[in-house]
């Protein structure tokens, strides 16, 4: 009699629930997963190697393209590592702006995550709600940087410029009539801070709508509860960070344990799960959005009262203000040298990590004293989480693999890099 062999199934890379270009080779016994083998590298763009041929500032836009839904958090880790090597301090206002945009980015990431996760599981409506809120936050990105996604707003030493005192207005066009444009501009008459404050006041109402749709939904709970359980011990052994670790009951958050920027002056709670399953990870990320909303409110209140510089005044690191550069020969020379030759960073090595929406995102630099990094290494949280997919999927059905991938919140820009 012939041996019974397990069935092998290719999941992706074109599958909509694969969250990018994941190719997952599943070994199945009927519909039960015996082994899950992730194949990565389909989005590899050699970011670490490219950084070796670019100046320290030129590599900032590459960071946006790693995890392309958590753009400014990637930039933050890069700038922190560069500043550590340079031994410079960011002005206080620059720190608060960074914290505020880190949290805007966290909400942006979690909105996309819950919209797509629900869509994968079969709850179609969620994505329509979350993309409505993402639009407002992307307008804030656009107001400060000119780009909706790849902002390149952070710089070694601070941020590119201070917050604008007026929001861009919608204009009448082929797609938007005068009435529609006026409706969209209702809360855009003030500054970026006014617009963002209005959003933070509205967001808890939207958030409660998400809870109404999903949290006690019988089908949602059946699909998530006791699926992809990770014990606290295993989560630590596998190197999980972020919501993947906190969902298993371990209160590890770099913003609390190793504060950077202005997080040591901000009040917020770290939500943790109990059971370590997909449902707990969902609840942790949902609560994180509310905590981020509160952090943004605190930053807005501080920024209103404390004007000041947003980037270091060391012209060997940051360019002088444009108006000075046009009237002062010395500052023109600084500007010219910075944009032709770049910063010369002292020889040494440094590692800096931030509490990224997906976990601990770290940048490790080795500098040989030149105007380019000798070596850059990216510590991507999603890479570690994807490595745990095999263990998390075993014994579950094929449909549960979709749930587990969704609860990991993986993006291939940072995994393949």
From Swiss-Prot:
Gene3D superfamilies: Cytochrome-c3 Hydrogenase, chain B (1.10.645.10). GO terms for cellular component: plasma membrane. It catalyses: a quinone + NADH + 5 H(+)(in) = a quinol + NAD(+) + 4 H(+)(out). It holds the Pfam family Complex1_49kDa. Its main location: membrane. It is a peripheral membrane protein. It is an enzyme of class 7 (translocase). It comes from the Bacteria. GO terms for molecular function: NAD binding; NADH:ubiquinone reductase (non-electrogenic) activity; quinone binding. InterPro entries: NADH_Q_OxRdtase_suD, NADH_UbQ_OxRdtase_49kDa_CS, NDH1_su_D/H, NiFe-Hase_large. The keyword Cell inner membrane applies. NDH-1 shuttles electrons from NADH, via FMN and iron-sulfur (Fe-S) centers, to quinones in the respiratory chain. The immediate electron acceptor for the enzyme in this species is believed to be ubiquinone. Couples the redox reaction to proton translocation (for every two electrons transferred, four hydrogen ions are translocated across the cytoplasmic membrane), and thus conserves the redox energy in a proton gradient. Belongs to the complex I 49 kDa subunit family. This is NADH-quinone oxidoreductase subunit D. The lineage of its organism: Bacteria, Pseudomonadati, Pseudomonadota, Betaproteobacteria, Rhodocyclales. The gene is nuoD.
């Amino acid at each position: 009699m012939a041996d019974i062999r397990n069935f092998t199934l290719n999941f992706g890379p074109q599958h909509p629930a694969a969250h990018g270009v994941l190719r997952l080779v599943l070994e199945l016994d009927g519909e039960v997963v015996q082994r899950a083998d992730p194949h990565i590298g389909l989005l590899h763009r050699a970011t670490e190697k490219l950084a070796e041929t670019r100046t320290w500032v030129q590599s900032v836009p590459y960071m946006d393209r790693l995890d392309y839904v958590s753009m400014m958090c990637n930039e933050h880790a890069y700038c922190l590592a560069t500043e550590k090597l340079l031994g410079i301090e960011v002005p206080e206002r620059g720190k608060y702006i960074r914290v505020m945009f880190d949290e805007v980015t966290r909400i942006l990431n979690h909105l996309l995550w819950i919209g797509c996760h629900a869509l994968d599981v079969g709850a179609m409506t969620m994505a329509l709600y979350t993309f409505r809120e993402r639009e407002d936050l992307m307008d804030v990105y656009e107001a400060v940087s000119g780009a909706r996604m790849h902002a390149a707003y952070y710089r070694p030493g601070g941020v590119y410029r201070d917050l604008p005192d007026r929001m861009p207005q919608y204009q009448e066009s082929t797609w938007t009539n005068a009435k529609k444009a006026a409706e969209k501009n209702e809360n855009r008459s003030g500054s970026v801070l006014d617009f963002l404050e209005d959003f933070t006041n509205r967001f808890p109402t939207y958030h409660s709508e998400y809870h109404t749709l999903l949290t006690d939904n019988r089908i949602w709970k059946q699909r998530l509860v006791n699926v992809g359980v990770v014990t606290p011990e295993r989560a630590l052994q596998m190197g999980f960070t972020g919501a993947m670790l906190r969902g298993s009951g371990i209160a590890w958050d770099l913003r609390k344990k190793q504060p950077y920027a202005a997080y040591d002056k901000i009040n917020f709670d770290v939500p943790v799960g109990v059971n370590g399953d997909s449902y707990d990870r969902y609840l942790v990320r949902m609560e994180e959005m509310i905590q981020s909303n509160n952090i943004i409110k605190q930053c807005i209140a501080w920024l209103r009262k404390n004007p000041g510089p947003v980037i270091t005044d060391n012209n060997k690191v940051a360019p002088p203000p444009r108006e000075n550069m046009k009237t002062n020969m010395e500052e023109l020379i600084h500007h010219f040298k910075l944009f032709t030759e770049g910063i010369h960073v002292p020889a040494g090595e440094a590692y800096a990590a931030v509490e990224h929406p997906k976990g601990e995102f770290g940048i490790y630099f080795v500098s040989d004293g030149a105007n380019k990094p000798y070596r850059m290494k990216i510590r991507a949280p999603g890479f570690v989480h994807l490595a745990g997919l095999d263990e998390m999927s075993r014994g579950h059905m094929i449909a549960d693999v979709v749930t587990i991938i969704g609860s990991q919140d993986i993006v291939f820009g940072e995994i393949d890099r």
